[in-house]
UniProtKB/Swiss-Prot annotation:
PROSITE patterns: SAM_GTMT
Source species: Synechocystis sp. (strain ATCC 27184 / PCC 6803 / Kazusa)
Region of interest (SAM motif III), ranges: 184-193
GO BP: methylation; vitamin E biosynthetic process
Pfam families membership: Methyltransf_11
Keyword GTP-binding tagged: no
InterPro entries: Erg6_SMT_methyltransf (IPR050447), Methyltransf_11 (IPR013216), MTs_g-TMT (IPR025774), SAM-dependent_MTases_sf (IPR029063)
Residue numbers spanned by region SAM motif I: 97-106
Membrane spanning stretches: none
Family per record: Belongs to the class I-like SAM-binding methyltransferase superfamily. gTMT family.
UniProtKB keywords: Methyltransferase, S-adenosyl-L-methionine, Signal, Transferase
Protein name (database record): 2-methyl-6-phytyl-1,4-hydroquinone methyltransferase
Region SAM motif II: start-end pairs: 157-165
Length: 318
């Protein structure tokens, strides 16, 4: 290498090493439900996530095969696609729904406004409850509360439908989570879940490079563990509360474009950098490696986007 390039190359290498070190040292690893609440409180308070993602802190649905789509519209389309897949579009107005892991209420408001459901959204984050309430007009039949999905405060059989999107990775015990979800569904009611899942490592163990990738996907966003699609379906059926079998589907293909689309939003909407200043810019850029790792993991089959539907067994069948 020419001598005049040694200093710039050295500075670039040093900068990359420092950035990588800071990325690893500032990971938001799961410690307890409080660490999850704190992470979402911070994301909600700073407003950056809402600025770029809108009301919906979940992936979008781009069709199968995927087509180019407005980023926010893809998230709205996801809610309708999930409602249709779960059979919720055939239910009457007034149906009671519990939205577990409701974020700032995007899905809850659609289910209330477009389907006429009476929705209760719960999240572990007080700031998300505050923001969801602020965003919900008085005439929309959706309300929000702080609650722990590992120990829901509702009596058995409280809701016609329980709905949950991308909350499962934050749950330390998937069997307990599965039982709590089904416990609060009325007999004959519906549970519909969408989640990030990992490949079933009982069938194909993680290899030498997949293990550190998975470690970062867990540690960076306060996830104790990912279930596999097969494993969580087994968790649901093991409760003894499911009529027949759990229905599953793999929505990796229609949701995959959302990862790179997330990064693209920051490029085509740079005004957000000005609105939130240098601190907001750094916080946004800091998430890019994790988003790219997510795209890699879902793209090569290390992770999958799982869909689950179960009908609660009637009391006479229990």
């Amino acid at each position: 290498m020419p001598e005049y390039l040694l200093l710039p190359a050295g500075l670039i290498s040093l900068s990359l090493a420092i950035a990588a070190g800071l990325y690893l040292l500032t990971a938001r690893g799961y410690q307890s439900s409080d660490s999850v609440a704190n992470a979402y409180d911070q994301w909600t308070e700073d407003g950056i996530l809402e600025y770029y993602w809108g009301d919906h802190i979940h992936l979008g649905h781009y069709g199968d095969p995927p087509v180019a789509k407005d980023f926010i519209q893809s998230k709205i389309d996801f809610v309708h696609a999930m409602a249709q897949w779960g059979g919720l579009d055939t239910l009457p107005p007034g149906t009671t729904v519990l939205d577990v892991g409701c974020g700032i209420g995007g899905s809850s408001r659609i289910l209330a406004k477009d389907y006429g459901f009476n929705v209760t959204g719960i999240t572990i984050s007080p700031q998300q409850v505050k923001r969801a309430t602020e965003l919900t007009p008085p005439d929309v039949t959706a309300k929000f509360a702080v609650d722990d999905a590992m120990a829901l405060s509702f009596p058995d059989g409280s809701f016609d439908v329980v709905w949950s999107v991308e909350a499962g990775p934050h749950m330390p015990d998937k069997a307990v989570f599965a039982k709590e979800l089904l416990r609060v569904v009325k007999p004959g009611g519906i549970l519909v879940v969408a989640d990030w899942n990992q490949r079933d490592d009982r069938q194909v163990p993680l290899n030498f490079w997949e293990k550190p990738v998975m470690r970062q996907l867990l540690d960076q966003w306060s996830h104790p563990a990912f279930a596999s699609i097969e494993g969580f379906a087994e968790n649901l059926e093991a409760t003894g509360l499911v009529e027949g079998q759990v229905t599953t589907a793999d929505w990796t293909v229609p949701t995959l474009p959302a990862w790179l689309d997330t990064i693209w939003q920051g490029i085509i909407r740079p005004q957000g950098w000005l609105q939130y200043g240098i601190r907001g810019f750094i916080k946004s850029v800091r998430e890019v490696p994790t988003i790219l790792l997510m795209r890699l993991a879902f793209g090569v089959g290390l992770c999958r986007f799982g869909m689950f539907k179960a009908v609660r067994k009637n009391a006479t069948q229990a």
